[in-house]
Amino acid sequence: MQLNLVVTEAERERLVRLSPTPETGPLLRTLLRLRHDFVIIGRAAASPLPQALQARLEPHSDVGTAIAEFLRASGAALLARRRPPGLDGVESALHSYAAAIDTVRQEGLTRCLPNDVTERFFALCFALEQLRHNLRDLQGCVAEWATSPRQTSDS
């Protein structure tokens, strides 16, 4: 895996003080957890949900956009050694989506679904919650890599 090679080289440079950077392990572990989150989300979303559920969740589909924007801004912050972007957009989108999921559950719309669809629905719910946690960890890693606590992000 190319990421492991890059991390190994970065850690080697850090240890001999050629690069005054934080330890690479936490960032690597966070990126791997995020990768696993996206694999689970991809598997859960591989087949479309029934139309009734899609119609209820569609107004809250800005979750992907908010996460993509946060990841792009985090990558830019890492490269520039700036403070991490805020998570407000992600948190707001995930909160809205979670509220829609709670409403779907309270109304019993998942009770009549086939088992495989129900499993994918709840796997997606779980994966999004894990993703929220791991994005917070990424934000912390980006903060560690920032060169100055006085610098702030544009987000």
Question: Which functions belong to the PLM regions below?
Answer:
Residues T30-S153:
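Soluble C-terminal extramembrane regulatory/interaction domains of multi-pass membrane proteins
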